[in-house]
Amino acid sequence: FFDPKAEDAANYGGIGAVIGHEIGHGFDDQGSQYDGDGKLNNWWTDEDRKNFEARTGALIAQYNSFVPLQLAEKYADDPDKAPHVNGALTIGENIGDLGGVNIALKAYAFALGKAAGKSDAEEDGSPAAIKALLDTAPEMDGFTGLQRFFLSYASIWRTKNRDELAEQYLQIDPHSPAEFRTNGIASNVDLFYDAFGVTEGDAMWLAPKDRVRIW
């Protein structure tokens, strides 16, 4: 997750996204029900809750459609039997993952701004300002800073399971399979499209209207 000798893109894409993920739990389907004193309290307006549920509902629907690749291959002869991710079971962790990546991207951008002597870098958190700061990252080994961020994020979820365990996890684990903690999240982040030039027709393309942003 973290290497003190690694460059910023790698660490923000690794431990940065994990820290952001944990912060995000304070505002997920469960954490959002508690106030600043840790008391169970509906501190949101009805409109806030309605909008939150609409966005989380869209994320649940996305994840309900996912089948782990290894299980899709296992059930290739009868795809209707292939087990899917449970979007409702995993929604809290998916909110954490999505928020964590967006938080880490902003933090990385602000770090780049400060390194360039822009003391007011954190004053403008607009998408355009964040993208402009990220574009100042030096290229390394043929990859931009933004690309290295996403490559690092993907690398922290590398895993391999037996088919039986993969199926069991779908039933009991509130975390999504690793491939969807990466690809499922990245497909909802506009900066991922900028990083790798993802366009309509590519496997990870989601139309802008279908991309979910909780926060």
Task: Specify the residue positions occupied by each region the protein language model found.
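Zinc-dependent metallohydrolase catalytic domains
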Residues: 1-16, 26-215
